Amino acid sequence: MNIQSLINDKVSQALEAAGAPAGSPAAVRQSAKAQFGDYQANGVMGVAKRLGTNPREFAQKVLDVLDLDGIASKTEIAGPGFINIFLSEEFLAKQAEAALADERLGVALETKQNIVADYSAPNVAKEMHVGHLRSTIIGDAVVRTLEFLGHNVTRANHIGDWGTQFGMLIANLERIQKEKGEVSMELSDLEGFYRESKKLYDEDEEFAVTARGYVVKLQGGDAFCADMWKKLVDVTMVQNQRNYDRLNVSLTRDNVMGESMYNSMLAPIVADLQEKGLAVESDGAQVVYLDEYKNKDGDPMGVIVQKRDGGFLYTTTDIACAKYRFEELNADRVLYFIDSRQHQHLMQAWTIVRKAGYVPESVSLEHHAFGMMLGKDGRPFKTRAGGTVRLADLLDEAEQRAIALIEEKNKDLSTEEKAKIATTVAMAAVKYSDLSKHRTTDYIFDWDNILAFEGNTAPYMQYAYTRVASIFSKADLSMDNLAGEVKITDEKEKALITKLMQFEEAVQAVASEGQPHLMCAYLFELAGQFSSFYEACPILNNDDESIKQSRLKLAALTAKTIKQGLDLLGIETLERM
């Protein structure tokens, strides 16, 4: 149950009954401090101002008709017109029982939508680097959350698998094959081939002519070029899948929807834009002028959709992409997890999409932008030599550091256990460090903070789960077969249950806003509430059997909630650390 939504609806009804205009926002929020209740309705003051009446007097009118029977034990007016709402212990205990009996922990399914999520998008013939991390793991966390809420989600890995670079790669691979025979098709080799191909393309005109010819042949469906292109894609995606699997990311080869997929749509789209009077010729190119965007002279900005040589641009592909996702995938929402530097480019493409009538306004096109991952020096994260950090190298280093940390913390574990724990902690640490930050901000990547067992980190959250689970393993009890009823005998119990009952609010916020850090913040607060409860409220050594059983239920619900929350982030838990 989403308690915030429940109360918001009740307050909205009361506002209207008290004379507020229909649709006036109740603005119900979780209270920042316990002294202000569990929830606070902040919408009264805005309505009172519009009505020209005293806010506190209007708040009283709202309270007079507010029906929170069976939900709140107390309501009060505070400050200039806030309404503080204190949840009843009986209501909370009942909700906790229901959540514990439900494998979904009380989280309701939403009305199903078709949602397309565009994320990760590495380039073919290049290894994934740290710049791909954010899109990959943020997108995957949101996708997992949307699926948990019952939505039909199509993962779209929009890989860079088309363009002039394939002409020079194919030409160079053919040259080397003629000299040396079959070429080893490892991605690390292709990285070297790529650099060599670029050098040849820039310095050898004969090679450049051949490469450009192969681009034309590839676009025309030439069998040799198509076969070589497919090999490049296959080798790249095999390597990328290793990274996805290590990171517990749910993308597979079946989710690849690369740039090449839209090739056949580009010319018809440009022709259609011309027919609709949107695309016009300018210096031999086809350009769409947008009044919504101005150049430095204040004139409508021109967006090129076809170059004078007949070639198409990323914008054209993105127009086709949005069109396809609505027409063929029946999308209700399309989410793009692409860095913030691409924002204007996407907005321009979508403006054209709307003007052309390819995607109606009822379909939400959303750019979930993100900031950069920075080194300790505040600059883009690089190797010591100043090069790009390969994602696989970052994950290797995370595992090495985690093994050293675990050997220091727990020398009694077997070598096999240490390796398993190190891998799980390492991948979780890299992911959680990123996911716990607000998506739109840049953040500093610092190994010491990432692997710390204190603060809002993966090791802390994994240990928090292990700590709760150990209560049951020590007592040889199952979390799924607990007797008795939940009862509240201490303020710490009430605070813990209140936080547990806000899980659905966190889940829905991640799904609607595309902000995984909201789940991280929730789980960190939940772990803190459990620590306070655990210190103040004895569990296994409690003399009152009914209180002992009740507290075991709260511990079980806490463990299950942390485990489920971390799972939505793509992070595994451990029974022992």
Curated annotation (Swiss-Prot):
Recorded catalytic activity of this chain's protein: tRNA(Arg) + L-arginine + ATP = L-arginyl-tRNA(Arg) + AMP + diphosphate
GO molecular function: arginine-tRNA ligase activity; ATP binding
The organism's place on the tree of life at top rank: Bacteria
Keyword Lipoprotein annotated: no
Example of a GO cellular component annotation carried by this entry: cytoplasm
Primary enzyme class: ligase
UniProt xrefs under PROSITE patterns: AA_TRNA_LIGASE_I
Subcellular location: Cytoplasm
Swiss-Prot/TrEMBL keywords: Aminoacyl-tRNA synthetase, ATP-binding, Cytoplasm, Ligase, Nucleotide-binding, Protein biosynthesis
InterPro entries per UniProt: aa-tRNA-synth_I_CS, Arg-tRNA-ligase, Arg-tRNA-synth_N, Arg-tRNA-synth_N_sf, ArgRS_core, DALR_anticod-bd, Rossmann-like_a/b/a_fold, tRNAsynth_Ia_anticodon-bd
Family: Belongs to the class-I aminoacyl-tRNA synthetase family.
PANTHER family: ARGININE--TRNA LIGASE, CYTOPLASMIC, ARGINYL-TRNA SYNTHETASE
Name of the featured protein: Arginine--tRNA ligase
Gene designation per UniProt: argS
